[in-house]
Curated annotation (Swiss-Prot):
ZnF segments: CysA-type: 1003-1019
PROSITE patterns: DNA_POLYMERASE_B
Gene source species: Plasmodium falciparum (isolate K1 / Thailand)
One GO location term (cellular component): delta DNA polymerase complex
Name the record gives this protein: DNA polymerase delta catalytic subunit
Binding, Zn(2+): C1003, C1006, C1016, C1019
Its job: This polymerase possesses two enzymatic activities: DNA synthesis (polymerase) and an exonucleolytic activity that degrades single-stranded DNA in the 3'- to 5'-direction.
NCBIfam families: pol2
Signal peptide: none
Activity control, per UniProt: The small regulatory subunit delta and PCNA1 increase POLD catalytic activity.
Length: 1094
């Protein structure tokens, strides 16, 4: 197992100084790829093991199985030359000869090479060696149904026609042997039930993967062969080549594989095409999967490198651009998967001298080119398996690559493991039903997985903001200093100490993504999802949800000898695709316990119980003429869809789902008995992946838009049966648990949604409600087909039911103590909510559900509204922050209009695309649109702008009314009345009206109108000294509050001896600091005026 090297307490390498010294010594004649000795020594501590001797031969032989962990896969088309194919020299000649033997039949007389697809598996050996496995002799194929009257002559003619069709494309003309094989195989289409079962199909194997789509299109147009027709529907022509390989050979994503001893050829060091430790060649049949058990369910010590860059705008205006503006620092944090996160090793590459940083390797340079070249050397020699960071795909990586182009640094483009393939950046977009559509970048860094934490968080969590600061506070309860790019230039040009400050900030931005990966178990969960679904790890990051079900479906079809149509021709159906049932809610605030009955894995269970599948769907009555009515399930609806029952034929989808559910049960048992924490995390990731996978199959069949194999007949049938089961449960509960059957109360189903029903049994005792819930679940489950099962899981008490899919309650699984407050559809967090609304929603729910005090909730709401209208609310609670997107300038939104205003005021500090824009809504003229009244919070403070409290009152009213309207008769009274009649309105010097009005002078003691400040006659005569002392006291209190906030910010930035320059507007302390600073200035002015009056 690879050992983690510990970082020295502090280490500074003055690369720039040493390099300049060397240039002087050698009269500027320094070799192009020269690496300073001190830097070389540092890298050697972290390089992978060496397996070659001095002349480049491997120090081990192929007489043992080679077992490696698969990280990534791709394929390339490579030219294999004639002298290689017939080469008989060398100690491993027989092995290489066996590997290349199949290529001989592809060689033409007039060419000395053949182009073939080679699958590249990037993997990791247990000792830390990275291994490139070049897999030979596997070729792509697809299927078409063979007409009954097709004979050998027709097959020969068909091959000729396919060659002619491919030759129409000039890129294929150079290949003499394009159709490698046509075989007749017995198999069956997945679509629809057929009584005759297996038929003859043609399995057509071709030379290159890109030929498959061309031939698919050709066959879909019907091919005429000797007056006979073939085609129309093509089978398995859409499956990516890599998936085709791993499915055929039962290899799953992120698994251990075995290259059998005596069958692989170890390449000489000089023949390597990659930066991996070593490379092998092997024929596909000698690579086999290893079962996920014992030591082979563990994840090896993957090398994960998290990095972050800092750059400056040379002219000081706007956001840096790679074409002109330099990278001044790159933090690089090396972490070995499975180790404690605090053991990571920190490197910081800086432009110009930087002071030492405890626990970090500081390498500083005199020029940017040398810095970037050294970082490239670092990447190649450290050889990370994963590249991570925060938004590295959309910012850091493109900036580095584009900066390399601007500086003509050709070497910087080679960040991947394949030596001669440059990394390039392409604009791309990602679309799926679950995640929507968003623009991104596509960067080819072969062999290294780009594991961007920003994308992972956005994909898996719904948050108010996705800045690193907000996300870190949400999950790690940590804040970080946010140094705005507009002040980076000053810090960079000041001193080694100021550059240290940038470096400390940059290092933290590299460490936090690793801590998030560790905290949220991203590696474990994604590895297990790849294993469960059989999908390559990288596909989970770059493709939608459907690829996971596609992989499972193809695997099961391969096992049971079915073929899958590439284009599904759906039947005509007028059946409207309805979703799940939602029983009309009986809205209210229920003090008595509400029992919840849940169907366990409802949709997967329906599939299994009723045998719903592509392969069991009846298309033609002719196919079931020999069957009895009891052999068929009819789904009542407009079309009366029909499926054969499992006694006739077991469906593929039910088999897949059944295996996933059973596997999850076994894994959960293993978790109970497992003592090792790492193994527990692996197993927990697996059970989660199994659960998600089982629940994804239904959605796969219902994906009519952009789906890979939609079948609305199956999806409609599932939801129809689900609706009938919810309705049947309601009817059975209410008819059995009633007074006429001897129960104390009549039960009522107050709500039902998708796979659960909420029942009010009438009792006030939580334990009794649980007993009745368990009894109801067992009793009603008997009326459904196995494995459909109704389970009692929880009781809510109290329970607040607002509407369909909107409820909250205290959740009990134990009658003695509630587990948590459970909210569904009640938005306490929305991106357009200010913190005040979020706080009020949470507090009101807490008072209603935990304190069970309606009056307290009402009084709290009124008091907060009064505080708002009298300007006693912390301004930071009113701030809304949004990100400025590329296309936002086309729309009139508050943050967009403000960005335009800020640009007019000062283009140097104005926000750019990608920046966060914070705003408050201020008062305006009558009829002025809201987006025109968005203003910068600091500008509001500086100019005493009047905040539009009515806007915030309306914003509060909408979500709170939804809660209170089901509890009290007149919920509007919360937002009108005595508590709303007193308003404090600030007077601004910035309005048009202020030019014509003279601001009245007020007494700082009693606020009465006076002619001469600071005090009125009454206060001057009776209270002057006490007012003065009170102002002094207020001044000191505000100072203390400011110092406390200042110290908290200094702790966050990791240094108690430097000024706070953080510009993190997602942090509430930022605005509190600004507001208190303003208050201190006002109090200072008042105290001074009182002194002068003496």
């Amino acid at each position: 197992m690879e050992e983690l090297k510990t970082c020295p307490f502090t280490n500074v390498i003055p690369y720039g100084l040493l390099y300049d010294k060397l240039k002087k010594e050698k009269n500027n004649d320094v070799p192009e790829n020269y690496v300073i000795e001190e830097f070389d020594k540092l890298l050697k501590n972290y390089e992978r093991p060496n397996v070659y001797d001095e002349i480049g031969n491997a120090t081990f032989k192929n007489d043992e199985d080679l077992i490696t962990f698969q990280i990534d896969l791709d394929y390339t088309v490579e030219n294999i030359f004639k002298n290689m194919i017939y080469n008989e020299s060398g100690s491993n000649n027989s092995i290489l000869n066996d590997i290349y033997m199949p290529y001989r039949i592809l060689l033409s007389k007039d060419k000395n090479y053949v182009s073939v697809p080679i699958i590249r598996i990037y993997s990791l050996r247990k000792d830390g060696c990275s291994v490139l496995i070049n897999v030979h002799n596997f070729f792509p194929y697809f299927y078409v149904e063979k007409p009954d009257d097709f004979d050998n002559e027709d097959l020969i003619k068909l091959e000729m026609l396919m060659n002619e069709n491919l030759n129409l494309n000039s890129q294929y003309k150079i290949y003499e042997k394009k159709i490698l094989k046509i075989e007749i195989v017995k198999t069956e289409s997945l679509m629809y039930f057929k009584k005759n079962g297996k038929k003859d199909f043609l399995k057509i194997t071709v030379l290159l993967p890109k030929m498959v789509p061309s031939l698919k299109k050709y066959f879909e147009g019907i091919v005429h062969v000797n007056n006979k027709s073939i085609g129309g529907i093509v089978y398995e022509a859409n499956l990516p080549f890599i998936l085709r390989y791993i499915i055929d050979h039962k290899i799953t994503g992120s698994s251990w594989i075995n290259c059998k001893k005596g069958h692989y050829y170890i390449r000489n060091k000089n023949k390597k095409i990659s930066n991996c430790t070593f490379e092998i060649d092997i024929s596909y049949e000698h690579v086999e999967p290893i079962t996920l058990e014992n030591e082979y369910q563990q994840i090896p010590k993957l090398r994960i490198l998290s990095f972050d860059i800092e750059c400056i705008k040379l002219d000081g205006k706007g956001f840096p651009e790679a074409k002109n503006d330099p990278i001044i620092q790159i933090s690089s944090i090396l972490y070995f998967q499975g180790e404690p996160i605090d053991n990571c090793t920190k490197f910081i590459f800086t432009l110009l001298e930087c002071a030492s940083i405890p626990g970090s390797n500081v390498i500083w340079f005199n020029d940017e080119k040398t810095l970037l070249e050294a970082w490239n050397e670092f990447i190649i020699r450290i050889d990370p398996d994963f590249l991570t960071g925060y938004n590295i795909i959309n910012f850091d990586l493109p900036y580095i690559l584009n900066r390399g182009t601007a500086l003509n640094l050709k070497k910087l483009k080679f960040l991947g493991r394949i030596k001669n393939v440059a990394s390039t950046v392409k604009d791309s977009s990602f679309s799926s039903k679950q995640f929507g559509t968003h623009e991104t970048k596509e960067i080819n860094i072969f062999g290294r997985i780009q594991f961007d934490v920003y994308d992972l968080i956005k994909r898996d969590y719904k948050l108010k903001s996705y800045t690193l600061n907000y996300v870190s506070f949400e999950f790690l309860k940590e804040q970080k200093e946010d140094v705005h790019y507009s002040i980076m230039n000053d810090l960079q040009n000041e001193s080694p100490e100021s550059r240290k400050r940038i470096a400390t900030y940059c290092i933290k931005d590299g460490v936090l993504p690793l801590r998030l990966i560790d905290k949220l178990l991203f590696i474990y969960n994604y590895v297990e999802m790849a294993r469960v679904t059989g999908t390559p790890f990288v596909y989970l990051l770059t493709r939608g949800q459907q690829i996971k079900v596609t992989s499972q479906l193809y695997r099961k079809c391969k096992e049971l000898n079915y073929v899958i149509p590439s284009t599904y021709m759906k039947v005509n159906t007028n059946e409207k695709y309805e979703g799940a049932t939602v029983l009309e809610p009986i809205k209210g605030y229920y003090i008595e316990p509400i029992s919840t009955l849940d169907f366990a894995s409802l949709y997967p269970s329906i599939m299994i119980a009723h045998n719903l599948c592509y392969s069991t769907l009846i298309k033609s009555n002719h196919e079931v003429s020999d069957l009895q009515n009891d052999d068929i399930t009819t789904i009542q609806g407009k079309n009366n869809l029909k499926f054969v029952k499992k006694n006739v034929k077991k469906g593929i989808l039910p088999l897949i789902v059944e295996e996933l559910i059973e596997a999850r049960k076994k894994v959960k048992l293993l978790i109970k008995n497992e003592k090792n924490n790492i193994t527990k995390m692996v197993l927990n990731g697996r059970q989660l992946a199994l659960k998600i996978s089982a629940n994804s199959v239904y959605g796969y069949t219902g994906a009519s838009s952009g789906g890979q194999l939609p079948c609305l007949e199956v999806a409609v049938s599932i939801t129809t049966l689900g609706r009938s089961m919810i309705e049947k449960t309601k009817e059975r509960v209410e008819s059995f648990y009633c007074k006429s059957n001897g129960y104390e109360h009549n039960s009522t189903v107050i709500y039902g949604d998708t796979d659960s029903v909420m029942v009010k049994f009438g009792t006030n005792n939580i334990e009794e409600a649980m007993t009745l819930g368990k009894d109801a679940a067992e009793r009603i489950s008997k009326e459904f087909l196995s494995p459909i099962k109704l389970e009692f899981e929880k009781v809510y008490c109290p329970y607040l039911l607002l509407n369909k899919k909107r409820y909250a309650g205290l959740l009990y699984t134990n009658p003695n103590k509630h587990d948590k407050m459970d909210c569904k559809g009640i938005e306490t967090v929305r991106r357009d909510f200010c913190i005040l609304i979020q706080q009020m929603m949470e507090t009101v729910l807490n008072k209603l559900l935990i304190e069970k005090n309606l009056n307290s909730a009402i009084e709290y709401t009124k008091s907060k509204i009064k505080e708002l209208l009298t300007n006693n609310i912390d301004m930071s609670l009113l701030v809304v922050t949004k990100s400025l997107g590329k296309t936002d300038y086309e729309t009139r939104l508050p943050h967009v209009e403000l960005a335009k205003k800020l640009k007019q005021r000062d283009s140097a500090t104005a926000p750019n695309v990608g920046d966060r824009v914070s705003y408050i809504i201020v008062k305006g003229v009558k009829g002025q649109a809201q987006y025109e009244r968005a203003e910068d919070p600091l500008y509001v403070l500086d100019n005493n702008l009047a905040i539009d409290y009515n806007h915030y009152l309306d914003a509060i009213k909408s979500p709170l009314s939804r809660i209170f309207e089901v509890i009290m008769q007149n919920s509007d009274s919360l937002f009108s009345g005595d508590h709303t009649r007193h308003k404090t309105i600030l007077t601004s010097s910035q309005t048009a009206l202020s030019k014509f009005l003279k601001k009245s002078v007020r007494c700082i003691g009693c606020n009465s109108s006076i002619k001469k400040p600071p005090l009125c006659n009454h206060c001057k005569e009776n209270k002057e000294f006490s007012i003065y002392m009170q102002k002094i006291k207020d001044f000191k209190n505000k100072q203390n509050e400011f110092f406390q906030l200042w110290t908290e910010c200094q702790r966050c930035q990791g240094n108690l001896h430097v000024d706070v320059i953080c510009m993190n507007r997602d942090c509430p302390i930022f605005y509190r600091r600004a507001k208190i600073k303003k208050d201190i200035a006002n109090l200072q002015e008042q105290v001074t005026s009182l002194r002068m009056d003496w």
